[in-house]
């Protein structure tokens, strides 16, 4: 019986066993201990084959190769004559992975990290990898201030060489900062410096940013804030010498000590721009001008670099290198800035692509582009395309990427990635007020009809006082130059008396069409014509109404009037300025418009109306979660010549679109009715509107509580103050009106004010809008409508 010789017994092969210079020829290879791993797979990983002449070095390579597969805990190679016997112990297979006690770290994140490390169900268990994962997770907890945290991997053996892996977390509590000390500050107090930190040793109740829980990343950010604070104030030699973080014995408290050297303040001496600026030296120098005696400012240096990059980017130099080297003169305390520029290659756009537009046609997006294919890359043109796509209102998000073309020194591809939102809506609206009760509204509208960018809509309202229906159509690119064409037809049966307005009924129908002409990127003009037929009846003898009838040659008497009709043709003119950052939930920019309507010869009436609307959004923080919104609306109309503007063209205020908290259309003059054959006048609470209006609103858009970042683009909350007034410039106080106690409706000073909160949500079920407002300043006869909501269905 041949004697087996032990060749290798560990991972590191030694040369203790020597077979001679020529080794031996392998006639056969046998494996012992294989369970999960197939013999063929094991043989493929071995550098030795049957028939090979092997030496001690070859055996060592064999063992290392088998260990490298990660399938074995132990490998031994023995020789029985000319047969190699490979004895292995397989690593156990992971049958399941579970977690316990993890609150700060979600299971999905843990599974992703384990997957990235090769730890997954069905794979072999590598105890070294598990130990590294334990340490890595504990380091993570330490970095967020949980110094008492521990992570232990519990391995439970199962039959057939399998194991259950369970990670047990003991997270503990976050260590809180007991004190932050800054040593070496002479020009500024410690409190003044710490007030700019996120980490605090004391956090007032009103500070929603400050945090006493220690986090390593936040400390690093605060140190950078401290450095920027000094560099922006001329301290060019400022340095953070050291930072000590000490832990209390119970691991629940943290003391932070920051040692700094302020150094003296330095002034800017001059700025020298040099290098390859591709012929744009003078433009770069204009961007780097300084004032005499100006302090050194680190942020300004960064802005100079960014401005030069943006300037070159407009001319196709997409990847310039801009480096600033400050030359500090400690004798006269000045700094000379040397800005070296290398414009690099000019890049041209090969392709512009769109991703995510499953509904919208490519042509709808492409016509908004200002960057052209084949032209040099202009960063401002690329950004303009992004802004215009956002402004369409079809997309929740728009991102743009510029990628260099592999193998080409001067070509890039531009890719716009969009996430479409539901632009079609089937809306069912409900309004409820303390006086108005319940009203209903239905509407079908598609702002991006079949992905063409056209708007098609059918809207209707039905309540106690109105039956309204309209069909609208608008093509924003009626011509390739961006001339738009829109139109609508409508029918309206309005019973003013049921709406607590001045008593009359108006059955009207009409149509209008409008052409829009783009002037530049942000301005456009509109020209349109319209026709409307009004059939008035059930008119009660109301002072302002009778004043209008008399101005058009009617003698209504004092018992009411039936069967008065008008046909009017109008010329409609408008202007719009829009630089909002997006069409849906804007966060910055201004949108303003002026609209004018004037009757033309052939009309029964002669009047004009002018309205001005504006909305301005100002972000208050970097991520634009806090935004200040200001809105305003002005309106004025009057008759031409001796005629008055029709009373049914009056302006109204109150309701969700003007002054929330007040009933719709209820703000302003109230009806004064003739009585006793015109001998007297009586007061009422029926609103009649006026020929002049002013509305203003200030709104603070805030982060929505308890909403994850995933839904932040579809939910908006705000706190607002609305104000407005409506008046009649043709109103005349007479002895009759004064005797009836009727106020002077010609005054613009009777301003109503309300305050409240609002929530808007583009939900999967449709657009939902909630508002609750309470009148702060009102007048006798005003009616409130404090709560309103709107529910819709989108597709």
Curated annotation (Swiss-Prot):
Any single biological process term in GO: Gram-negative-bacterium-type cell outer membrane assembly
Record PANTHER family: OUTER MEMBRANE PROTEIN ASSEMBLY FACTOR BAMA, SORTING AND ASSEMBLY MACHINERY SAMM50 PROTEIN FAMILY MEMBER
Keywords: Cell outer membrane, Membrane, Repeat, Signal, Transmembrane, Transmembrane beta strand
Transmembrane segments: none
Family as reported in the entry's similarity comment: Belongs to the BamA family.
Compartments (UniProt record): Cell outer membrane
Residue ranges annotated for the POTRA domain, each copy included: 24-91, 92-172, 175-263, 266-344, 347-421
Domain of life: Bacteria
Alphabetical list of Gene3D superfamilies matching this protein: membrane protein fhac, membrane protein fhac: a member of the omp85/tpsb transporter family
The protein's name: Outer membrane protein assembly factor BamA
Pfam families: Omp85, POTRA
Lineage: Bacteria, Pseudomonadati, Pseudomonadota, Gammaproteobacteria, Enterobacterales
Chief subcellular location: membrane
Organism: Yersinia pestis
Signal peptide segment: 1-20
Quaternary structure annotation from Swiss-Prot or TrEMBL: Part of the Bam complex, which is composed of the outer membrane protein BamA, and four lipoproteins BamB, BamC, BamD and BamE.
Keyword Membrane (UniProt): yes
Its job: Part of the outer membrane protein assembly complex, which is involved in assembly and insertion of beta-barrel proteins into the outer membrane. Constitutes, with BamD, the core component of the assembly machinery.
Coiled-coil regions listed: none
GO cellular component, one term: Bam protein complex
């Amino acid at each position: 019986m041949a004697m087996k010789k032990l060749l290798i017994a560990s991972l590191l092969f030694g040369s203790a066993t020597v077979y001679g210079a020529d080794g031996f020829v392998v006639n056969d290879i046998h494996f012992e201990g294989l369970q999960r791993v197939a013999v063929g797979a094991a043989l493929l990983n071995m550098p030795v084959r049957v028939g090979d002449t092997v030496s001690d070095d070859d055996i060592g390579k064999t063992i290392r190769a088998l260990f490298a597969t990660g399938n074995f805990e132990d490998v031994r190679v023995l020789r029985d004559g000319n047969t190699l016997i490979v004895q292995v112990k397989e690593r156990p297979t992971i049958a399941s992975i579970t977690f316990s006690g993890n609150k700060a770290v979600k299971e999905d994140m843990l599974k992703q990290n384990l997957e990235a490390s090769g730890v997954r169900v069905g794979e072999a268990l590598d105890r070294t990898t598990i130990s590294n994962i334990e340490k890595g997770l504990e380091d993570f907890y330490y970095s967020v201030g949980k110094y008492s945290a521990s992570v232990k991997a519990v391995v439970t053996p199962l039959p057939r060489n399998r194991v259950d892996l369970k990670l047990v977390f003991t997270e503990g509590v976050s260590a809180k900062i007991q004190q932050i000390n800054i040593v070496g500050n002479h020009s500024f107090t410690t409190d003044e410096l710490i007030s700019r930190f996120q980490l605090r040793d004391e956090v007032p109740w009103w500070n929603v940013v400050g945090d006493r829980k220690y986090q390593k990343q936040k400390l690093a950010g605060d140190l950078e804030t401290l450095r920027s604070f000094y560099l922006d104030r001329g301290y060019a030699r400022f340095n953070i010498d050291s930072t000590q973080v000490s832990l209390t014995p119970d691991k629940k408290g943290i003391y932070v000590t920051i040692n700094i050297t302020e150094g003296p303040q330095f002034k800017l001496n001059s700025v020298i721009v040099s290098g390859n600026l591709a012929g744009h030296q003078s433009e770069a120098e204009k961007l780097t001008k300084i004032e005499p005696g100006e302090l050194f400012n680190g942020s300004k240096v960064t802005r100079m670099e960014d401005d030069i990059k943006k300037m070159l980017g407009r001319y196709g130099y997409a990847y310039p290198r801009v480096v600033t080297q400050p030359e500090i003169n400690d004798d006269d305390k000045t700094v000379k800035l040397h800005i070296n520029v290398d414009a690099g290659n000019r890049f041209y756009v090969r392709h512009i692509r769109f991703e995510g537009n499953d509904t919208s046609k490519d042509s709808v997006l492409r016509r908004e582009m200002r960057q052209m294919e084949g032209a040099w890359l202009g960063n401002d043109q690329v950004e303009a395309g992004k802004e215009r796509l956002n402004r369409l209102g079809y997309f929740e998000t728009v991102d743009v990427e510029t990628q260099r073309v592999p193998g080409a020194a001067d070509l890039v591809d531009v890719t716009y990635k969009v996430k479409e939102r539901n632009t079609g809506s089937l809306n069912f609206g409900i309004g409820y007020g303390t006086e108005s009760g319940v009203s209903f509204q239905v509407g079908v509208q598609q702002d991006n009809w079949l992905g063409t960018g056209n708007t098609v809509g059918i809207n209707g309202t039905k309540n106690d006082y109105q039956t309204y229906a309209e069909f609208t159509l608008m093509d924003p690119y009626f011509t390739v130059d961006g001339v738009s064409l829109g139109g609508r037809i409508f029918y309206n049966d309005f019973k003013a008396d049921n709406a607590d307005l001045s008593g009359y009924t108006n059955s009207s129908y009409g149509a209008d069409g409008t052409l829009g002409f783009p002037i530049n990127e942000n301005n456009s003009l509109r020209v349109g014509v319209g026709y409307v037929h009004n059939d008035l009846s059930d008119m009660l003898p109301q002072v302002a109404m009778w004043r209008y009838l008399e101005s058009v040659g009617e003698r209504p008497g004092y018992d009411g009037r039936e069967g008065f009709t008008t046909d009017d043709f109008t010329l409609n003119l408008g202007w719009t300025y829009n630089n909002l950052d997006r069409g849906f939930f804007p966060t910055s920019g201004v949108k303003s418009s002026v609209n004018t309507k004037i009757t033309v010869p052939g009309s029964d009436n002669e009047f004009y109306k002018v309205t001005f609307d504006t909305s301005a959004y100002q972000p208050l923080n970097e991520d634009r979660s806090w935004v200040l919104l200001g809105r305003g609306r002005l309106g004025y109309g009057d008759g031409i010549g001796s005629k008055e503007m029709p009373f049914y063209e009056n302006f109204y205020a109150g309701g969700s679109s003007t002054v929330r908290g007040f009933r719709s259309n209820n703000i302003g003059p109230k009806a004064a009715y003739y009585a006793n054959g015109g001998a007297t006048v009586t007061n009422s609470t029926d609103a009649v509107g006026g020929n002049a209006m002013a509305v203003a609103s200030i709104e603070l858009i805030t982060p929505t509580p308890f909403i994850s970042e995933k839904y932040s683009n579809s939910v908006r909350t705000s706190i607002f103050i609305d104000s407005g007034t409506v008046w009649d410039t043709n109103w005349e106080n007479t002895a009759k009106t004064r005797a009836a106690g009727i106020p002077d409706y010609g005054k613009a000073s009777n301003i109503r004010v309300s305050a409240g909160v609002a929530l808007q949500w583009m939900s999967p079920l449709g657009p939902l809008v909630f508002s609750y407002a309470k009148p702060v300043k009102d007048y006798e006869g005003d009616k409130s409508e404090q709560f309103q909501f709107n529910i819709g269905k989108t597709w």
